[in-house]
């Protein structure tokens, strides 16, 4: 396995007095143990190696902690590819083309916006294909050349004692090509960083924590590779009056002690901007719940609508006249 090969290559017993090999050996073990975590394996499968760089996809302080060193990504990808059965092919194709990284954008909306839906305009700083070299990374009029060290494979094999170890080509860094005359705008990367404006459709009934995927709106690929995706992570701000449970809404409405005892009506505002009148029967108790059918949240991509549940709270008067006190004492 890739782990065993790398572990044997950098084992301290095989490399006495070699501090660099000892450091690599520790990193190999750390990477292997880290990637046994199902959550982190899922993150790598979704976001690639970018999920473990700079604290993850905008999350801050996440997967990136403790992973340093310029050559660590090669070790990391070797081990992860072996664990997932996919080798090192993720995001990279022939000719040095690499898929662009996926991006994450956090968006907060109000409960009213989640109720009605909206089209939001967002600005996203991202990498786009260089318009000078059309993504090739080479100066116009020139072409990348096949790497002479690895013959275009991006990998080389080296003897290590009794073993033959495959590693990333040191000349082309796994791309399989070299660019003798790089583009002056993108410096051979095939992409540049700009800020783009995008429209995001937020459907009515969207729930807190929903993820919206915009295919191909992530970072541009390297040297003509496909673009990554943009993921919009939505959070719905808590409402000052309503609480949400799926498609149903809940609220508490205070009524006077007189209304509770003798009956009456009150109006309650709803998210559609209207008011609904609720009839209170005589002898209504604290905690009594009324249901307004169809006054809750719309069900996502459906014609169904949830209900609004109103819980009664009874206001106890704090200041009573002598006459009011006498009347209450008669109960």
From Swiss-Prot:
It is found in: Cytoplasm. Residues 1-48 form the J domain. CXXCXGXG motif repeats lie at residues 130-137, 147-154, 169-176, 183-190. It comes from Rhizobium tropici. Residues 11-22 have a biased composition (Basic and acidic residues). A zinc finger (CR-type) spans 117-195. The gene is dnaJ. Zn(2+) 2 binds at residues 147, 150, 169, 172. Pfam families: DnaJ, DnaJ_C, DnaJ_CXXCXGXG. GO terms for molecular function: ATP binding; heat shock protein binding; unfolded protein binding; zinc ion binding. Participates actively in the response to hyperosmotic and heat shock by preventing the aggregation of stress-denatured proteins and by disaggregating proteins, also in an autonomous, DnaK-independent fashion. Unfolded proteins bind initially to DnaJ; upon interaction with the DnaJ-bound protein, DnaK hydrolyzes its bound ATP, resulting in the formation of a stable complex. GrpE releases ADP from DnaK; ATP binding to DnaK triggers the release of the substrate protein, thus completing the reaction cycle. Binds 2 Zn(2+) ions per monomer. Keywords: Chaperone, Cytoplasm, DNA replication, Metal-binding, Repeat, Stress response, Zinc, Zinc-finger. Belongs to the DnaJ family. Its main location: cytoplasm. The J domain is necessary and sufficient to stimulate DnaK ATPase activity. Zinc center 1 plays an important role in the autonomous, DnaK-independent chaperone activity of DnaJ. Zinc center 2 is essential for interaction with DnaK and for DnaJ activity. Transmembrane segments: none annotated. One of its GO terms (cellular component) is cytoplasm. Homodimer. This is Chaperone protein DnaJ. Residues 1-22 are annotated as: Disordered. NCBIfam families: DnaJ_bact (TIGR02349), PRK10767.1 (NF008035). GO terms for biological process: chaperone cofactor-dependent protein refolding; DNA replication; protein refolding; response to heat. InterPro entries: DnaJ, DnaJ_C, DnaJ_domain, DnaJ_domain_CS, HSP40/DnaJ_pept-bd, HSP_DnaJ_Cys-rich_dom, HSP_DnaJ_Cys-rich_dom_sf, J_dom_sf. Its cofactor is Zn(2+). Zn(2+) 1 binds at residues 130, 133, 183, 186.
